[in-house]
Design a protein with these regions (language model features):
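Short alpha-helical elements
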Residues: 1-297
Length: 297
């Protein structure tokens, strides 16, 4: 589909889901109704993220210039940004509903990983006042990166749809965050070696029905068959692909805001945009993680 078709498709999808959840959240207590509808704002955000418009200014300018005929009431950037931020709960609810209606939330095999989320340059971290006391120093062994900020937890299905994305502290080792990543899930969980903890894995399996499968370290024995380990290693490539999407296409590691509330709002927006892309690919019977091929430029 081309860009026009994509925008219309996203708008129809947003309207369908918004009608279901709009009575759950008290969005505004009084005053005049905004000129731009909530459905239009959500569509602008999702499409803007997909088009790699990382900042509110870029997003507003692009659609004001090229799609004023689609969104004739898009006139004031400040009002648009404020309205978008106030819809953070709606965005989270729509993202959750898409995992439900697509059937992906019940996938018995879901893969976990974490991503570093720096909030500023490492050398500026000592002077940061925006995220104290929430942000902290962390280390990403895979990227050999020391950073100041948070971790983004990821749990995805075999198709690549994100079913859980908790915002986690940066300092603890991944294994200490395992309970947050598998909360509410029962099934098989392929993970990397950073999640190896025999005692914790045994407790999760016996008490909660969560079977965390990790590749063994050198000279480490394992009860898992080579076939299972090979299958889990193949599945882990999916979470690495999703991590690359979020880092490169959706720029989650370059969120430059001044407080935790706006940080979470921007993060939820990017997660929703990724989920919409995977959802549409599934509907069109395309490779779920082929986001580049979804829209022809």
């Amino acid at each position: 589909m081309d860009r026009d078709e994509f925008i219309i498709t996203v708008y129809c999808l947003v309207c369908e889901q918004y009608q279901v959840i709009k009575n759950t959240y008290f969005l505004r207590r009084g005053g005049f109704a905004p000129a731009l509808s909530d459905e239009e704002v959500l569509t602008l955000e999702v499409c803007g993220e997909y088009f790699k418009l990382a900042t509110d200014k870029d997003l507003f300018t692009y659609f004001r210039t090229h799609y004023a005929h689609f969104f004739p009431h898009l006139r004031d950037r400040t009002l648009f940004v404020r309205q978008a931020a106030n819809l953070w709960q709606v965005k989270a609810a729509i993202q959750y509903r898409l995992t439900q209606v697509s059937g992906q939330a019940t996938d018995p095999v879901q893969i976990i990983d974490t991503l570093p989320l720096p909030v500023c340059g490492y050398t500026r971290s000592g002077r940061d006042r925006c995220f104290k006391p929430f942000a902290d120093y962390g280390h990403c062994a895979a990227k050999k990166l020391d950073y100041y900020g948070f971790k983004l937890g990821l749990r995805i299905t075999r198709c690549g749809m994100i079913t859980a994305c908790p915002l986690l502290p940066a300092r603890p080792h991944d294994i200490q965050l395992l309970d947050d990543l598998v909360a509410g899930f029962v099934g098989l969980v392929p993970a990397d070696k950073g999640f190896i903890d025999t005692f914790r894995q045994t407790v999760l399996a016996e008490r909660h029905g969560v079977f965390v499968i990790t590749a063994p370290r050198k000279r480490m024995t394992t009860a898992h068959s080579p076939g299972l380990l090979k299958a889990c290693a193949r599945l882990r490539k999916g979470v690495e692909t999703v991590g690359s999407h979020l880092t490169e296409r959706f720029a989650v590691a370059r969120l430059r805001v001044h407080d935790l509330w706006h940080f979470q709002h921007r993060l939820i927006r990017k997660i929703l945009a990724h989920t919409v892309g995977v959802f549409l690919n599934l509907q069109l019977r395309r490779p779920p993680l082929d986001l580049d091929g979804l829209v022809t430029l």
